[in-house]
């Protein structure tokens, strides 16, 4: 029952979160900082009340270690959201971030000197090729759509290229953070709720560096058309409503993944999260009518095939089906 509940939270929370994020960035592409700040503040407040008992509970992992992790987490979160201001379409944003498993594996080989099976190396190639196809096709669209004059087209392309560089850096930084987190958990034990709180609480002063951008977007949000909130009946600017729903659904998504990790094997968690990403991509393409060519579909399919190959989901399906048939015969 808990597993079904967690899967529901993941699909409903994470998919709707992407919808509200896209509603925000379509009108204000540079609103990534205020979105990140709102998400961090909400999760930090919830953790302060329920995890640290209003600051009375001491951390199990030394704060000095959290400072290193938080610096990486803050950088990744800000860059990922800020990249949307560089002509990066939401579908490409999602596909690019699907390479996180592979980035983790590459850094694992370089830093931890890990060795993997041939199927894992094949998955690296597949995901890399898939992301490359989608990126090249998106580059062509940037040239076509933004190129009013040759100079405008070059500027738009360079702007987009900077966004791609930001996503690549964030992907590798996120993988490095994952390795660092793994070493901390081995040394001090798993304290995911605690890590979630400190990862969102400690970076809050860092948003002072982005305060001007956050304030400007808060003003713009307040000037958006009013709407009546369903059920409650209160009226509020539509962009503030989208931001509120984005924050709430982000929390539901995170909680769903957390429950899932305590109830299921890591393979199941990865499969659920991968399927969720694919569904989010479909929603983004169909509902928001984002440009998506046949080559984009090919690239997406290759990315997800590589991800499933990496997690050994494909090879485990026949074994699971065989076990199911044996159980049926025993009955």
Curated annotation (Swiss-Prot):
Membrane topology: Multi-pass membrane protein
One GO-annotated biological process of the protein: UDP-N-acetylglucosamine transmembrane transport
PANTHER family: NUCLEOTIDE SUGAR TRANSPORTER SLC35B4, SOLUTE CARRIER FAMILY 35 MEMBER B
Primary site of residence: Golgi
Organism: Danio rerio
Domain of life: Eukaryota
Transmembrane region(s): 5-25, 30-50, 59-79, 92-112, 122-142, 153-173, 201-221, 238-260, 267-289, 301-321
Gene name per UniProt: slc35b4
Function as written in the Swiss-Prot or TrEMBL entry: Sugar transporter that specifically mediates the transport of UDP-xylose (UDP-Xyl) and UDP-N-acetylglucosamine (UDP-GlcNAc) from cytosol into Golgi.
Pfam families, per database record: UAA
Matches recorded under InterPro entries: SCL35B1-4/HUT1
Protein name: UDP-xylose and UDP-N-acetylglucosamine transporter
């Amino acid at each position: 029952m808990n597993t079904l509940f967690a899967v529901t939270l993941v699909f409903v929370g994470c998919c709707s979160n992407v919808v509200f994020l896209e509603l925000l960035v379509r009108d204000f592409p540079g609103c990534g900082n205020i979105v990140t700040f709102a998400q961090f503040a909400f999760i930090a407040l919830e953790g302060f009340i329920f995890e640290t008992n209003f600051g009375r509970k001491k951390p199990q992992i030394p704060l000095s270690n959290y400072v290193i992790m938080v610096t990486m987490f803050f950088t990744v979160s800000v860059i990922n959201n800020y990249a949307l201001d560089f002509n990066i379409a939401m579908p490409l944003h999602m596909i690019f971030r699907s390479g996180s498993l592979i980035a983790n594996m590459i850094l694992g080989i370089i830093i931890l000197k890990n060795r993997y099976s041939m199927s894992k190396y094949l998955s690296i190639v597949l995901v890399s090729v898939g992301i490359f196809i989608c990126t090249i096709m998106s580059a062509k669209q940037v040239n076509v759509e933004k190129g009013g004059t040759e100079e405008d087209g070059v500027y738009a392309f360079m702007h987009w290229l900077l966004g791609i560089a930001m996503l690549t850096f964030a992907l590798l930084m996120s993988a490095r953070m994952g390795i660092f987190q793994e070493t901390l958990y081995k040394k001090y034990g798993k304290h995911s709720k605690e890590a979630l709180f400190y990862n969102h609480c400690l970076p809050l002063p860092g948003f002072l560096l982005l305060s001007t951008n956050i304030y400007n977007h808060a003003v713009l949000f307040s000037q958006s058309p009013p709407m009546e909130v369903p059920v409650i009946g209160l009226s509020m600017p539509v962009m503030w409503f989208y931001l509120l729903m984005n924050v709430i659904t982000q929390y539901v998504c995170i909680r769903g993944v957390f429950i899932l990790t305590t109830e299921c094997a890591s393979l199941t968690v990865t499969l659920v999260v991968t399927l969720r990403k694919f569904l989010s991509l479909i929603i983004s393409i169909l509902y928001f009518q984002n440009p998506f060519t046949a080559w984009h579909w090919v690239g997406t399919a290759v990315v997800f095939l590589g991800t499933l190959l990496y997690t050994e989901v494909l090879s485990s399906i026949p074994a699971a089906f065989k076990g199911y048939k044996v159980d049926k015969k025993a009955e």
